[in-house]
Amino acid sequence: MKTVRIETFGCKVNQYESEYMAEQLEKAGYVVLPDGNAAYYIVNSCAVTKEVEKKVKRLIKSIRNRNKNAKIILTGCFAQLSPDEAKNLPVDMVLGIDEKKHIVDHINSLNGKQQVVVSEPGRPVYEKVKGSFEDRTRSYIKVEDGCDNTCTYCAIRLARGTRIRSKPLEIFKEEFAEMVMKGYKEIVITGVNLGKYGKDMGSSLAELLKVIEKVPGDYRVRLSSINVEDVNDEIVKAFKRNPRLCPHLHISVQSGSDDVLKRMGRKYKISDFMRVVDKLRSIDPDFSITTDIIVGFPGETDADFQRTLELVEKVEFSRVHIFRFSPRPGTPASRMEGGVPESKKKERLDVLKEKAKDVSIRYRKRIIGKERKVLAEWYVMKGVLSGYDEYYVKHEFVGNRVGEFHSVRVKSLSEEGVISCRADMVEGKVPARG
């Protein structure tokens, strides 16, 4: 029996591609294991920061230490960007991003000698996942690859290619309908630069969202990360028209300072971002906006950072992902002057974390007493379910049916989410843990 484990780092696009590899391997007779020792390990890596690269390297060394005879295949953005560094790790094969699509051929070609197969990214996006995602509640559909933005700090466009490649609408329709038919309750539409979907073939993300509206079923749709400049009026109207489209967007603002945004190569000003926020919140005052912010970008002053704090306070993000600036090889930002000392980055990180925590609590307090639709995904303990609502807020509540939607009413806050009860219950206390 040929057993394989796939370890995935990074974004939802990587998660989709790992699922695609798993399906191809299973078709070829391999057994894909969720845990335990395997004969083959595929590490689908990320390269968005130095820290995640370190995690990738640690995992590979850990696998090799506990399983000397395993065959280890390293793929993903780190492998694509740094093949020379990757081949110095204890791996049997280094594969580029486009090579994932032919994982079976590559794994079958292992011959005892280390192989490095990394081509220039740029192949069309035609792959389809049939739907064997582990939890059977949430699935992903990758509709786009590549990024034609010119952000000065980002290496992902170098890994994924600078040309937008969109999945044809007909292929998307088939894949989406199949996911709904198989009973997935939440379908996440993802891409490296999702908002640019269709640019290469005379279509658009708004057109794709119109396709979704016509598909009946008990499901909901969530969009993954999108850039400020791509949230146009047609996208906003789609949220207004389609109740299945989750009122949540992850919009990476990166900084609250226009000066910093300009040095980052971002294509908007904070006033543009606020217009988008206002339009979304005019549809639904609770519209959930999550974001990414980089602290310590070269040249960031105390005044710039203060503007970021003020933005977080004003927008009331439901969640903020914070990163210390990490210079990526080959990017313009890695050569910029005005570097911020690591001690100052750490200080700003800690301050922003506290601010983000405060506004998240404030956002969640506002929804106490409101009814939400939660997709139960796992048990916290016997008789207590947990999952996310349409606004991407995590709930805990008494119940016993995983993989279904539950109407709940928010009662109080938890550490990272809320405690709720079934909407038809007066009380629904969650038992204390331990």
Swiss-Prot record:
Enzyme Commission identifier(s): 2.8.4.5
Binding annotation for [4Fe-4S] cluster 1: 11, 46, 77
GO biological process: tRNA methylthiolation
Function: Catalyzes the methylthiolation of N6-threonylcarbamoyladenosine (t(6)A), leading to the formation of 2-methylthio-N6-threonylcarbamoyladenosine (ms(2)t(6)A) at position 37 in tRNAs that read codons beginning with adenine.
First-listed, main subcellular location of the protein, grouped into a coarse class: cytoplasm
Cofactor(s) the protein needs: [4Fe-4S] cluster
Cofactor note: Binds 2 [4Fe-4S] clusters. One cluster is coordinated with 3 cysteines and an exchangeable S-adenosyl-L-methionine.
Keyword Cytoplasm annotated: yes
Keyword Disulfide bond: no
Disulfide bonds: none
Chemical reaction(s) catalysed: N(6)-L-threonylcarbamoyladenosine(37) in tRNA + (sulfur carrier)-SH + AH2 + 2 S-adenosyl-L-methionine = 2-methylsulfanyl-N(6)-L-threonylcarbamoyladenosine(37) in tRNA + (sulfur carrier)-H + 5'-deoxyadenosine + L-methionine + A + S-adenosyl-L-homocysteine + 2 H(+)
Domain Radical SAM core, residue spans: 133-362
Annotated protein name in UniProt: Threonylcarbamoyladenosine tRNA methylthiotransferase MtaB
Any one Gene Ontology molecular-function term assigned to this protein's record: metal ion binding
Gene name in the database record: mtaB
Enzyme class: transferase
UniProt binding sites for [4Fe-4S] cluster 2: 147, 151, 154
Residue ranges annotated for the MTTase N-terminal domain, each copy included: 2-112
